[in-house]
Design a protein with these regions (language model features):
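C-terminal peripheral helix-coil segments that are non-catalytic and often amphipathic
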Residues: 1, 96, 100, 131-140, ...
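Basic, helix-initiating cap at the start of DNA-binding domains
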Residues: 1-27, 32-42, 56-60, 65
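Residues at secondary-structure transition points
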Residues: 3-11, 53-57, 61, 65, ...
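Helix-turn-helix/winged-helix DNA-binding modules
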Residues: 26-29, 50, 170
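Short hydrophobic/aromatic patch on the recognition helix
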Residues: 41-52
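Hydrophobic alpha-helical connector segments
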Residues: 61, 75-100, 153-156
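Amphipathic alpha-helical packing segments from all-alpha helical-bundle domains
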Residues: 65-71, 117-142, 150-154, 177-180, ...
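Short secondary-structure transition hinges
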Residues: 95-135, 165-167
Length: 196
């Protein structure tokens, strides 16, 4: 008979994932052992393996959870408003997620090659879904640019994906202002960005 699940199973699993994101973000996946993860969680390696069959599964879970939050934000942003309003809402949601989950975002950007093929395929499929949403918005805003919407989409992500490294919630630039600036820059070029 299978052992019943502990009442705090989800809480413990989430704590392991938070520690994994923090350690993988700081030391890299290859530079972190399961013993390091267990120590950070103040638990045993065997308990880590109770929640995750392998170290690879912890990496996959960190990435999948972060991508699921991004997919949910994209889906929510697509519900109302014009294409430009949806792009602004999506950009703001993404920036908030990037800053609020710095470690997970860093892991997603830097550790993809460490996933086993099967898990990498799943993560890349989620990334492509998010890219497709933004590409659709750009195409809706500027249908005349249809032949180059994918490169424009990738430029857009190049502009916002690294904000987690420098944007601080307590800083002079709010996520809201930066999201608007990014969309203005994307849609109207540098001439549209104001200093105020």
């Amino acid at each position: 008979m299978a052992r019943p699940q502990s009442p705090d199973y989800d809480k413990r699993r989430d704590a392991i994932l938070a520690a994994a994101a923090r350690l993988y973000g700081k030391r890299g996946f290859q530079g972190t052992s399961v013993a390091d993860l267990a120590k950070a969680c103040r638990t045993s390696k065997s308990l880590i393996y109770h929640y995750f069959p392998s170290k690879d599964d912890t990496l996959h879970a960190v990435m999948a959870a972060h991508l699921d939050a991004l997919v949910d934000a994209a889906d929510e942003a697509m519900q109302t408003g014009s294409a430009e309003e949806r792009l602004r809402a999506l950009t703001l949601s993404f920036m908030r997620l990037y800053v609020g989950a710095r470690d997970s975002h860093k892991v997603l950007l830097n550790e993809l090659e460490n996933l086993p093929d099967r898990q990498r395929v799943e993560v890349v499929a989620k990334q492509r879904r998010i890219i497709a949403v933004v590409e659709t918005l750009i195409r809706d805003i500027r249908p005349d640019l249809n032949p180059i919407t994918l490169p424009l989409t990738m430029l857009f992500f190049g502009m916002i994906n690294w904000t987690h490294t420098w944007l601080r919630p307590e800083g002079r630039m709010s996520a809201e202002k930066l999201a608007d600036m990014a969309v203005d820059l994307m849609l109207h070029g540098l001439g549209s960005v104001r200093a105020d």
